[in-house]
Amino acid sequence: MKRWAKILLIVIVVVVAIAAAVPLFVDANTFRPAIDRQLSRALGRSVTFGDLRLSVFSRSLVAKDLSVADDPNFSAAPFLTAKEVRIGVSLRPLIFSHEVVLRDFEIESPQIAVIRDASGAWNFSSIGRRAAAGAPGSGGVAEKAASEASQGSAAPLPDFVVDLIAVEDGRVAFSTVPGRGQAIVYDHVNVTARDFAFALRFPFDFSADLPAGGTINVSGHLGPINGGDAAATPAEAQITVKGLDPVAAGFIDPEDGLSLLADLNVHTAFDGQTSTTNGTVHIEHLKLRKDAAAAPKPVDLAYRGTHRVREYSGQIDDATIKVGDAEIHVSGTYHAMAPSASGAPSAANAKGATGTPGAVSLEVPVLNLKLSGQNLPIDELQSLMTAAAVRLPNGSKLKGGVVSLNLVVTGPAKSLVITGPIAVDNTRLVGFDISNKIHGIASLSGVKTGDTSEIQKLRVNVRVTNGGVVANDIYAVIPAMGELNGSGTISATNQLDFNLVAKVSSASGLGKVGVDLFSALNGGSGKKSGVPLRITGTPDEPYITADVGGVFQKTTNPITSLFGKKK
């Protein structure tokens, strides 16, 4: 072996021996108080961990049983726990000067508890607040920081800087106080923040598995950390979500009846108060009601808007809902429902009964939206009709034609009021024979439509609430029956109650005798004033009768004239 090779080998052996021997002469646990102080001061929370050991080769201290205290206003249990954390340190000052210079953190499989209270505040909001006003995590710190935030002054930021903070394979449980149901759990959470400093903007990456198998990936920048409220830290990010089930994820109450699977691609910019977003959403298996079947076709949504976090309010500048070639546009505003003095929700404003900002019910937004669409192909909208459990008689379907609508959607999300005009042109109701549903005097008229009813025109103003549907100013042109005018209601239990007047003089489904009979039974005025019709039953099984009350009290001359005068 050559001389230089021997020297190199000896050097390597010596270095390895020294590295292996250092932990024998350096008690890593002596650095625990210094690290405790640094982390507790930086986070404004009590930070503790168990046994420490030095790993020279990875240039880190390996800590067992990490625990970070929660904000005592939320929970006495820890905010974060982990079996092991690797704390990167600079070895030279550590070994020779016993000085702890932190470089990075790698936390393995932590358990993190994220909690939101009724006002929308988060338990991580107080992270980073200075402990000068009290012990880390004490009420004094929280009260002082909250006071500073309300006065518009910025809390001082910790001088804590590291190259890397990494969370690997974590588990995050989201819950609310007061508690309602089980926590929503996100598994396999991975977070990376590079060049981290409280006072600077830094890049980060986040990924996790969502409940029911979906995934989320976020890349962007955070910072500087807001010293009074970490939840108000400015951020810019690109968010990609695959296979989101919002019911399983806890965003939608199962009792609302809405369910779907969605893929999202969203860009957001948050200045600490307002978030400006735009993006696209691809929706499959959409259900708008509990008793509905899933939409057979996907629905695509493109939107842009703003959201004010503290007030939990925002504006939808434009959202385009696309089903095939049909496009429906939505715009408007929303805000949180404020509780009344009795504790029940009130839509007055975004302040509570006591005037405290943020004392709002975040689960019940109040909407003020406009929904419009012009000349929408009815064939494309069949998918949405399925998702909304729209029932047509005897399982029939609309074929061809277009629909236009201009609706206003207002009120709390759980008790919306939808009003406005709807217009339908040149469609066919396939699979329903009107003539088989007409009873009483009308059945004598000889109406024959077959299993397809043509609807040339339909105009109606609707008002839809939880109590049912009110339809006013109905005007329809159905060639088999003539022109129809009137109004009616559909109850919350799907009971029909419509009163229409049919001008039958031009009805193609009636013979001349039928037209004359209608007219005669109505006192000779059927061709001009029309024949009253009553529709009851359900959308599945409508029952149509001629309203002949009082007809037989009229003169019998029109009836006798129908069959000719006395010879």
What is the meaning of each model-derived region?
Residues 43-50, 259, 455:
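A short, amphipathic edge element
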Residues 129-158, 353-354:
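Intrinsically disordered, low-complexity linkers and terminal tails enriched in Pro/Gly
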